[in-house]
């Protein structure tokens, strides 16, 4: 109410939403609010397995069943991209074949990803709505809030695409386009045909329900933990009460007023100056790419990856390769934004450092401790550089000077160190760039956590898996190097995770509660050389659900609490 309500209404206008909620606990909380408000126990949500942990924990809180879908891997750089549209469509079609499409309530994706992969949000929503017209979309755009204020990137945001779809729905040509495609497809087209076709939804059946979360503190000028949850939902009146309950669940009763004010200031700044600020951030990023990749010394040991290295060719329908390609211009970049299944956020730059003999964590430490350059994300052999609305050309000059200095030190070490130094360096580079572990995919939930899951879908009761860990006698620990793990992987019984296991980097859960652990997951963990692994204690080992406990999952416990009489 009052001033805050007016500020939220202005934010909704700025972002193209029906309503916006200010959140003071970060986008982790925004995500959990949305998941809790929109999903109920037993509902199915199609979720990117590599999304932020807040989404997974949100599923636990809601009692919803995640149906995990996999992003395409970039094994060479120990990171994942984004989830192909055909993978999402296949999940929906499988649910339909199993007679459980009505239970699939939400598609939950990260846009853009930490490494800069941007979905074709309009195409994703249109094709999914062609299969399920009332599907809810939750776009986690924690790192992409600034994109609304770029005429080039806006179309790739959840709300930007939602507004475009809404306008299309009111165009009489939309019905004709739908009916024309239906006539071409005929009755009961096969899944193979549906997967190959760019599906057009029936505009008369669509119930447009789009939610978008933004970390305003990440890419704009809000105080730390300032976040916005934006809503464009024609059915919001049916969930408004539970949405408020979700807000009450997570919001502090003692919010920081300066933080709330900073969200309004950020909105005002971006409405007045956002176009120029974002354009400058993009220009800064392209200048960094050009300076790194064209410098004879720096490019000998470092390089910034382009779309041709980060996005497989089958997802770049326009043929766009890189912002630095001689044939690249704004027209080809716009064609990529319009046509490609995935494109790259130009402000996010993956700098390969493994070719200089540094792993990501090591190089991050050097930049921070010796040169006061802050890096947010690393991989086995790269670091992520980001330009933002506050960067200047001086920042570019400083970064390039630092990279040239480090490259010079590497070069001198090899020149002066002789054959042994070169041999050691080559072995180190090979270890970082070639001998990389395969990235593990999600396997499946143990049958004890599958309930009535469909034959073709892999959703599971993650909430029961999570709380199974609360039963200490029902859990066991096995160290990663214990031969017992290898024996059980071969002969059984299955290893079932009792917790989330999240190594940093890469920062996604390689195990979730209730998941059956496979050989590829163990191999990946054994090859990890990172120090930070949430949910795993090297001294104790992997926390597993005992087989005896699995057999009891879902059965009523003896001595259930008696019903209490009403107070007289």
Where are these regions (language model features)?
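Short loop-beta-helix segment that forms the pyridoxal 5′-phosphate
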Residues: 12-34
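Short amphipathic alpha-helical segments embedded in low-complexity Lys/Glu-rich regions
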Residues: 26-29, 75-76, 383-384, 420
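Non-catalytic terminal extensions of PLP-dependent enzymes
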Residues: 1-5, 12-13, 158-185, 198-204, ...
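Short glycine-rich or small-residue beta-strand-to-loop segments that form or flank ligand, phosphate
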Residues: 21-23, 107-110, 350, 384-388
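Gly-rich Lys/Arg/Thr-decorated short loops/hinges at beta-loop-alpha junctions or inter-strand turns
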Residues: 10-16, 67-76, 345-346
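Conserved PLP-enzyme active-site core in the AAT-like
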Residues: 30-40, 44-293
């Amino acid at each position: 109410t009052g001033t805050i309500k007016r500020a939220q209404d202005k934010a909704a206008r700025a972002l193209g939403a029906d309503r916006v909620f200010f959140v003071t606990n970060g986008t982790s909380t925004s995500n959990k609010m949305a998941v809790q408000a929109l999903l109920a126990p037993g509902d199915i949500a199609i979720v990117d397995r590599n999304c932020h942990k807040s989404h997974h924990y949100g599923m636990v809180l809601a009692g919803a069943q995640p149906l995990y879908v996999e992003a395409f891997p970039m094994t060479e750089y120990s990171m994942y991209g984004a989830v192909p549209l055909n993978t999402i469509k296949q999940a929906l079609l499988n649910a339909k074949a199993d007679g459980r499409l009505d239970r699939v309530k939400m598609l939950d994706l990260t846009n853009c990803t930490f490494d800069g992969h941007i979905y074709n949000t309009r195409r994703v929503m249109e094709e999914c709505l062609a299969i399920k017209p009332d599907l809810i979309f939750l776009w986690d755009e924690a790192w992409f809030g600034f994109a609304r204020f770029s005429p080039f990137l806006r179309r790739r945001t959840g709300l930007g695409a939602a507004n475009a779809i809404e306008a299309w729905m009111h165009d009489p040509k939309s019905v004709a386009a739908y009916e024309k495609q239906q006539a071409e497809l005929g009755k009961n087209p096969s899944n193979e045909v549906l997967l190959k076709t760019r599906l057009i939804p029936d505009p008369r059946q669509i119930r447009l329900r789009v939610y978008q979360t933004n970390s305003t503190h990440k890419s704009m000028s809000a105080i730390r933990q300032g976040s916005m949850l934006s809503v464009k939902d024609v059915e919001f009146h049916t969930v408004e009460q539970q949405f408020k309950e979700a807000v009450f669940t997570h919001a502090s009763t003692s919010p920081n007023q300066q933080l709330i004010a900073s969200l309004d200031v950020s909105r005002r700044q971006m409405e007045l100056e956002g176009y120029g600020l974002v354009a400058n951030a993009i220009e800064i990023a392209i200048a960094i790419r050009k300076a790194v990749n064209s410098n004879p010394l720096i490019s000998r040991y470092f390089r910034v990856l382009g779309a041709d290295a980060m996005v497989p060719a089958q997802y770049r329908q326009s043929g766009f390769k890189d912002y630095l390609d001689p044939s690249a211009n704004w027209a080809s970049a716009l064609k990529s934004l319009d046509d490609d299944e995935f494109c790259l956020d130009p402000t996010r730059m993956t700098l390969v450092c493994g070719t200089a003999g540094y792993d990501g964590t090591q190089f991050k430490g050097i930049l921070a401790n010796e040169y006061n350059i802050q890096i947010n994300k690393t991989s086995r052999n790269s670091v992520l550089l980001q330009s933002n609305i506050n960067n200047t050309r001086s920042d570019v000059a400083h970064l390039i000077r630092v990279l040239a200095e480090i490259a010079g030190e590497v070069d001198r070490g090899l020149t002066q160190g002789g054959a042994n130094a070169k041999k050691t360096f080559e072995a180190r580079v090979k270890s970082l760039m070639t001998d990389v572990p395969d990235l593990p995919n999600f396997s499946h939930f143990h049958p004890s956590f599958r309930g009535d899951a469909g034959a073709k879908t892999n959703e599971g009761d993650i909430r029961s898996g999570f709380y199974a860990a609360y039963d200490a006698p029902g859990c066991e620990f096995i160290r990663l190097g214990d031969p017992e793990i290898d024996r059980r992987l071969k002969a059984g019984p299955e290893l079932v995770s009792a917790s989330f296991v999240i190594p940093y980097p890469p920062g996604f859960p390689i195990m979730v509660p209730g998941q059956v652990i496979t050989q590829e997951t163990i191999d990946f963990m054994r090859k990890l050389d990172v120090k930070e692994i949430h949910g795993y204690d090297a001294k104790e080992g992997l926390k597993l659900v005992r087989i005896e406990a699995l057999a009891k999952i879902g059965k009523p416990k003896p001595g259930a609490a008696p019903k209490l009489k009403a107070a007289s």
